[in-house]
């Protein structure tokens, strides 16, 4: 990512956020303020996909180059922000995801944490359970809990939907 590019951090929440999330945003703001554009936030409940669409619409009203969608119960250390920004490229890698885990029922007493990175398979998208830590690699799909997207991708999606 070009050093002059600005990143807007966007999140959806019901009116409150996790303390760890808030603290990680404070740390980012204190140490990387020159990289950050305006924060975008959608407050409310309901269908999360609709909230994320409203978030994208709000982001596209800013002048920022990148949107970093964050789940409001996640934490983003400054070092992880730096890795995402370093890996991103507006043409070669316009979408970069940080690794986030979700919990799924497995029939065991406790939910199984599953990485929200996926490979396409005949039976559908399957979670990738084996990956090199601290590396950048291509996936077929990723969750939106920590997703960095270049403006051009979102503009193209908007324009093609109209």
Placement of each model-derived feature along the sequence:
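Polar low-complexity intrinsically disordered regions
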Residues: 11-12, 45, 73, 82-87
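Residue-level marker for beta-strand->alpha-helix junctions and adjacent short loops that shape enzyme
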Residues: 14-16, 74, 101-103
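N-proximal low-complexity "stem/linker" segments adjacent to membrane-targeting elements
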Residues: 1-46, 50
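Conserved catalytic core of nucleotide-sugar-dependent glycosyltransferases
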Residues: 56, 77-162
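Active-site nucleotide-sugar/metal-binding loop of Leloir-type enzymes
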Residues: 53-66
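Short beta-strand-to-loop acidic/aromatic patch adjacent to the donor-nucleotide binding site
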Residues: 64-75
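Local beta-strand N-terminus motif with an aromatic residue
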Residues: 7, 64, 92-93
